[in-house]
Regions:
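Conserved helicase motor core of SF1/SF2 NTP-dependent helicases
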Residues: 1-118, 128-172
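Short, flexible loop segments at boundaries between secondary-structure elements
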Residues: 124
């Protein structure tokens, strides 16, 4: 059909894993031949500082416009205290399968059982849960792994255990 309109959407710089043998840029160039390339560089989730850092890493301009975005480093005690003051439906907590994520959740359930319990928390350590039939409720705090978090969003995101050594394990 000569009048068909094809739209290819994606950003190869945002991929986590590179397990394809396909050279995507080459394929798109051959498949589409004559096309318009649009760059989406405005990010509504990140601050300008984080967006600039990410843009440097990805070698492309990214404009962060979220002035409310804050990054803070905390120890477990500080995180427990911070989370105890939040509404469960605002929270997405991401971590490795065994580490500070589960320790923090255990403490929250023990010290703040009215706020953090089986009715208010969706917890999973499986890397494929976001593809399954079990879904977190809109009013639940979410405690899960990085790989299982695709498509999950909350007002507050807490990252656990994302160290250089953890990154090295993931990329190998």
């Amino acid at each position: 059909n000569p009048k068909i309109q094809i739209i290819a959407v994606g950003d190869m710089q945002q991929k986590i894993y590179d397990k394809t043998t396909l050279n995507v840029s080459e394929f798109i160039n051959k498949f589409l031949d004559d096309y318009v390339l649009l760059e989406f560089t405005r990010c509504f989730r990140l601050s300008s500082e984080l967006a600039a850092r990410l843009g440097r890493i990805w070698n492309k301009p990214i404009i962060g416009v979220n002035s409310e975005c804050r990054v803070e480093r905390m120890n477990i005690d500080q995180v427990v205290e911070f989370l105890a003051q939040q509404e469960p439906e605002d929270l997405l907590c991401l971590g490795s399968r065994n580490g500070d994520l589960s320790k923090t959740l255990n403490r929250l359930e023990e010290e703040y059982p009215v706020i953090y319990n089986k009715a208010t928390v969706y917890a999973s350590i499986s890397d494929s849960d976001s593809m399954g039939s079990t879904e977190p409720k809109k009013d639940s705090a979410i405690f899960t792994t990085y790989d299982s978090s695709k498509g999950l969003e909350r007002k507050i995101v807490v990252i656990f255990d994302y160290t250089e050594s953890y990154w090295s394990v993931r990329i190998n």
